[in-house]
Amino acid sequence: MAGSGGLGGGAGGGQGAGAGQGAALRASRAPMLLVALVLGAYCLCALPGRCPPAARAPAPAPAPSEPSSSVHRPGAPGLPLASGPGRRRFPQALIVGVKKGGTRALLEFLRLHPDVRALGSEPHFFDRCYERGLAWYRSLMPRTLDGQITMEKTPSYFVTREAPRRIHAMSPDTKLIVVVRNPVTRAISDYAQTLSKTPGLPSFRALAFRHGLGPVDTAWSAVRIGLYAQHLDHWLRYFPLSHFLFVSGERLVSDPAGEVGRVQDFLGLKRVVTDKHFYFNATKGFPCLKKAQGGSRPRCLGKSKGRPHPRVPQALVRRLQEFYRPFNRRFYQMTGQDFGWG
């Protein structure tokens, strides 16, 4: 029995010693396992093609004072005042057309007025950049004080199908200015501008008339823009005629103070920009500013303004005049203005 007890005691002692050695062994292996796991994770991340994909570039942040929520109306809740003098507002007035009608000249003339703050470049928000959102659009605008008017001009709006609906969604009270010009001379001026950038352009005849000999090709944008009545018809589905002012591109050259005076009246502004601000540059055939905004010297518009037009045979000019005549007459009826284009 004693032997059995001894044997039992020896076995128990051996098991206790073995358990102690196993625990010690496991304890000694733990740091090694931890090191192996860390090294394994590092190797996985360091192997080519195994790193996490690079984070996408963040979307352009809005201007510091802009809210992150979407905006649907000027002055809507959640649009805090911008820091600094004044605040950025949605435009109360837009020069929406037309290309090569005199929009740049009108904008520069209006910028002489102390109560007009205008964006210098064309933002193309309502035709090309609408997906960026109204908060982004407002962040582009200059700061204005109470009583000042924010403006921008993008002449392609007038011929953009979606523009009237989008502008109405921003504000149904927006005032719309359209500078129009004889559609024949406008088309030739449009062609001259394109030709200056694309020397290998086909002839005016080849573009304006199908196969150079057939009927007028309204698929060519230079021709299609001049169908003012058709474009206006679409705009009138969203805005009443009282929201429009139609400025004569021809009178903007011959009597800039008179046309700018009409615009100031339309915007509810005092007539500050007058004859004293203009002089006629015989070389360019254009009115120039005696004192440009922010300057003390006279200034004419850019070199591209008043560029010579290519010679177009009179027979082609007459065909275009005949083509546009019914559209012009309808435009006169719609606007209540006779622009004298025939």
Swiss-Prot record:
Please give the InterPro entries that the UniProt record associates with this protein.
NST/OST, P-loop_NTPase, Sulfotransferase_dom
Q: What is the protein's given name? A: Heparan sulfate glucosamine 3-O-sulfotransferase 6
Q: Name one GO biological process term.
A: blastocyst hatching
GO MF terms here are: [heparan sulfate]-glucosamine 3-sulfotransferase activity
Could you tell me which residue ranges are on the Cytoplasmic side of the membrane? 1-31
- Topology Lumenal: residue spans: 50-342
Compartment list = Golgi apparatus membrane
The answer to whether UniProt assigns keyword Chloroplast to this entry is no
Enzyme type, top EC level: transferase
Query: Which Pfam families does the entry mention?
Result: Sulfotransfer_1
Residues that coordinate or bind 3'-phosphoadenylyl sulfate: 100-104, 181, 189, 305-309
Report the disease annotation for this entry: Angioedema, hereditary, 8: A form of angioedema, a disorder characterized by episodic local swelling involving subcutaneous or submucous tissue of the upper respiratory and gastrointestinal tracts, face, extremities, and genitalia. HAE8 inheritance is autosomal dominant.
Q: Where is the composition biased (Low complexity)?
A: 66-85
Species: Homo sapiens
Q: SUPFAM superfamilies, per this entry? A: P-loop containing nucleoside triphosphate hydrolases
Disulfide linkage: 288-300
Glycosylation: residue positions: 281
Give an example GO cellular component term for this record: Golgi membrane
Topology in the lipid bilayer is annotated as: Single-pass type II membrane protein
The entry's function note states:
Sulfotransferase that utilizes 3'-phospho-5'-adenylyl sulfate (PAPS) to catalyze the transfer of a sulfo group to heparan sulfate. The substrate-specific O-sulfation generates an enzyme-modified heparan sulfate which acts as a binding receptor to Herpes Simplex Virus-1 (HSV-1) and permits its entry. Unlike 3-OST-1, does not convert non-anticoagulant heparan sulfate to anticoagulant heparan sulfate.
